[in-house]
């Protein structure tokens, strides 16, 4: 195996990347290799989808399947080799159907792509693993060099993150022919193993720009379905009674679970990136959506073990449920998979509900502890004039966007310490699961505004970006001239594509941590610093003084 896509990848003087029997995430070498083969199959599919478009042939089923299957290769999503092979077979079957349609419309049509005629060379896993070696992501690294390899990975992993957001939008009924075409373009291009540095950098920015449109699409889908998020208090302590925990990002799954449990006396708790769901009017109207349980995804083996009911995983992040001995109580949905864990097909949650009814549930209610969520795009934009007034009156010195992915490294305490150190005349916006480092602390208010504003899930960076754009327009300045600084934490591929989106939009001087991506060389980091001012976090005092010294 060779995998370097997440923040916890193995790092050694000889090179970075997980390359042993098992990755740091728990992914087996077998599954990792088969995911490489799946990616190649999806690149073959995209090559034919592009050619089909030239002949005015489009297939919505294929366009939605491709990013969904790609999503299965993200960190902590699908560890089930059998399902990965199934996706690869399905991709090539769809590819062949496109080939047939193209030949029927234009006999003699040929696809000039190195993966156009890719075939799986066997039925058994061992044979497919041997074939997968041809598509290992580092197979030509010695030939092309670490810089080109790193830029390829930047685009590949960024496109993975964009594919995940495409799937989230698709679930909510959002489609865009322009986005599908762009996705297939970048996917097919990556299948050619590009080697030109300028093209690789340009296309990485192109993927970031495309993702901005995807996030807008997802924002539209969520707000049309569930209303604009508004500030809402959420209890983070359990209540007595039967219970179900839902984790991941899929608000549609939460909606269906709430509908199917309504009136049954079962309390539903959100976990991880589901926390922002409480801000949506059409979700919080369900009285049995009673609160949020737990913290960042990396703590789930301890927290899920203590949860006295079933757990539903709707997207990333799942880790080995056997460690906490709750594998009989966890269920997977959609693209999520773990060997031996029960997977739900369709939208019937009756098996999960039945299990909740026989589980013990919480024996008593704990003392309530409320936190506030729901500072979505509309709420932020409505507050823009107040922010401008506070800045003009010199009552608001600076705004910090402090958030991103959480993880297990000790260095992530930086984000807790940074939040605590931010002066009282500054606001803090936060998003994604990195907020769990400090979202239960008390930050008070600034002239009536809460100092801590929970913007939402990772994709809700869109709302923060739109606030920045709106403020810049009203103040007649550029985004980089605002009293705004971004201090981001990363772990996986959604964070990579959000970073690419910010860079593509011209946002500069972003602080990132806790470590640099393992696929980015010192030379590439220097290029990103030179072009965009992107820099690594250092110490809280040094970074805070560096920012406010210029504020």
From Swiss-Prot:
EC number annotated for this UniProt entry: 1.7.99.1
GO terms of biological process kind: response to hydrogen peroxide
Pfam family, one: Prismane
Origin superkingdom: Bacteria
Keyword entries, A-Z: 2Fe-2S, Cytoplasm, Iron, Iron-sulfur, Metal-binding, Oxidoreductase
SUPFAM superfamilies tied to this protein: Prismane protein-like
Any one Gene Ontology molecular-function term assigned to this protein's record: peroxidase activity
Residues at which hybrid [4Fe-2O-2S] cluster binds: 249, 273, 317, 405, 433, 458, 492, 494
Residues recorded with modification Cysteine persulfide: 405
Ligand binding ([2Fe-2S] cluster): 3, 6, 18, 25
GO cellular component: cytoplasm
Major site of localization recorded for this protein: cytoplasm
Cofactor(s) of this protein: [2Fe-2S] cluster; hybrid [4Fe-2O-2S] cluster
Catalytic reactions on record: A + NH4(+) + H2O = hydroxylamine + AH2 + H(+)
Subcellular location: Cytoplasm
Enzyme class: oxidoreductase
Function: Catalyzes the reduction of hydroxylamine to form NH(3) and H(2)O.
Family statement: Belongs to the HCP family.
HAMAP family reported for this sequence: Hydroxylam_reduct
Protein name, per record: Hydroxylamine reductase
Species: Edwardsiella ictaluri (strain 93-146)
Lineage: Bacteria, Pseudomonadati, Pseudomonadota, Gammaproteobacteria, Enterobacterales
